[in-house]
Amino acid sequence: MLYDGSSRIGGLAHILLPSEGLSLDSDNRAKFPSTAIPMLIEEMRKRGAWGRPMAKIVGGASMFASLLPSGGINMGERNVEATKRVLRLAEIPLVASDTGGEHGRSVYFHVSDGRVVVKSLKMGERVL
């Protein structure tokens, strides 16, 4: 999630893969951090965002780890690292995160104040 507190404008992307090279169909720019983050910034600016955005990351779980061979690819972890790399390159501060583990999460993004509420059966509720 990106949020500009000055204008109270934000957006989020559901990152599915760390790079376009891992997809058979790379037409959906919102699936990859290298294209989703610039797209979010562009859309926020179109809607009047003028301040410096900040970021919060949620997700990156390895929900099916028990089905993977030991040492197998952890796509969630790779998505988180790729997202952090793109944020660093764009000089967008990462101010909070709730990532990893083996549990799913529900995310509620309150654009009015930038709060992100993360809920999971395993970990309960957390506000970022």
Give names to the regions the model predicted.
Residues 62-77:
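Phosphate/ribose-phosphate-bearing ligand recognition and processing surfaces
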Residues 52-59:
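Short glycine-rich phosphate-binding loop at a beta-alpha junction
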Residues 16-21, 59-63, 100-101:
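Acidic, glycine-rich active-site loops and adjacent beta-strand->loop/helix elements
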Residues 47-48, 90:
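Residues at alpha-helix termini
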Residues 23, 66-68, 107:
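Short, well-ordered secondary-structure micro-motifs
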Residues 31-35, 39, 52, 74-78, ...:
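Conserved active-site and cofactor/substrate-binding residues in soluble primary-metabolism enzymes
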Residues 76-128:
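Divalent-metal-activated hydrolytic enzyme cores
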Residues 1-47:
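Conserved mixed alpha/beta catalytic, RNA-binding, or beta-rich assembly cores of soluble enzyme
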